[in-house]
Swiss-Prot record:
EC number(s) reported in the record: 2.1.3.-
UniProt GO BP: tRNA wobble uridine modification
Stated name of the protein: Carboxy-S-adenosyl-L-methionine synthase
UniProt: S-adenosyl-L-methionine binding residues: 36, 61-63, 111-112, 126, 193
GO molecular function: carboxyl- or carbamoyltransferase activity; S-adenosyl-L-methionine binding
Cysteine pairs bridged by disulfides in the record: none
Catalytic activities: prephenate + S-adenosyl-L-methionine = carboxy-S-adenosyl-L-methionine + 3-phenylpyruvate + H2O
Pfam families reported in the protein's UniProt record: Methyltransf_25
Signal peptide limits: none
Magnesium recorded as keyword: no
Organism name: Nitratiruptor sp. (strain SB155-2)
Gene: cmoA
Protein family: Belongs to the class I-like SAM-binding methyltransferase superfamily. Cx-SAM synthase family.
Lineage: superkingdom: Bacteria
Quaternary assembly: Homodimer.
Length: 239
């Protein structure tokens, strides 16, 4: 796995999932999101426990395909796994990894906002909604809800902010300390923060829950949290 050094040099553009990021993404995400491996294992297990033969599962912003590959390996059923991403560089790595593991996954280059979804049992979105502009975020969640079958599940992870400014700063400081322990320098941390400005737009935990409820989900609950990183499960059922 190539080590992430993307922000070791002065940035010249806003953050994007280009070839440079894709080449180090697996290392970047593992060192940038606390308990990422454990969190993805939790998401995988939620999915595996809620699918049956031929169920359709979408991963929105699938990046290099690691989660869908893990689901394919762990599920006792043959599933229709569809990974969508806007980055060709990410998808090339996803195709290569899936082939190496001998699993069948339909990776597609797509705009998840305009994509025509088929009925599905599961939707996954790991740290993807936060990159969708706020005006388009709720309409996307509505599309997800509409495409889910009854009792279908939307599992999504998001970086969140606190409504309390003091706590929010403290959580950010704790997070930056975490990144330093992962080997990132103060310069790299500052560079990435600047590159993500107005690209990653987080909501509070409450705003995320209110959004999915407004779209029709009868149940939503956080199932994992570390400081300002949260994973939610929302279920399509009558309130």
């Amino acid at each position: 796995m190539e080590k992430d050094k993307v922000f070791a040099k002065p940035i010249e553009k806003r953050f994007e999932f280009d070839e440079e990021v894709a080449s180090v993404f697996d290392d970047m995400i593992a060192r940038s999101v606390p308990f990422y491996k454990e969190n993805m294992a939790l998401v995988r297990d939620i999915v595996v426990k809620n699918v049956v033969q031929k169920d359709r599962v979408y991963d929105l912003g699938c990046s290099t395909g690691s989660l869908l590959i893990d689901i394919a390996k762990r599920s006792p059923f043959s599933l229709e796994l569809i990974g969508l991403d806007s980055s060709e560089a990410m998808l090339q790595r996803a195709h290569h990894k899936a082939k190496a593991f001998g699993v069948s996954i339909d990776f597609q280059k797509a705009d998840i906002i305009s994509y025509a979804y088929k009925p599905a049992k599961i939707f996954i979105s790991n740290y993807t909604l936060q990159f969708i502009r706020p005006l388009k975020r709720e309409p996307l969640v509505q599309k997800i809800y509409d495409a889910l079958v009854d009792e279908g599940i939307f599992v999504f992870s998001e970086k969140v902010i606190s409504a309390d400014k003091t706590l929010d700063k403290q959580l950010l400081d704790i997070y930056f300390d975490f990144k330093k322990k992962q080997g990132y320098s103060d310069f790299e941390i500052a560079q990435k923060r600047e590159a993500l400005e107005n690209v990653l737009v987080p909501y509070t935990l409450e705003e995320n829950m209110e959004m999915v409820k407004k779209c029709g989900f009868g149940f939503v609950e956080p199932i994992f949290r570390w400081a300002n990183f949260v994973t939610f499960v929302a279920i399509k059922r009558k309130k």
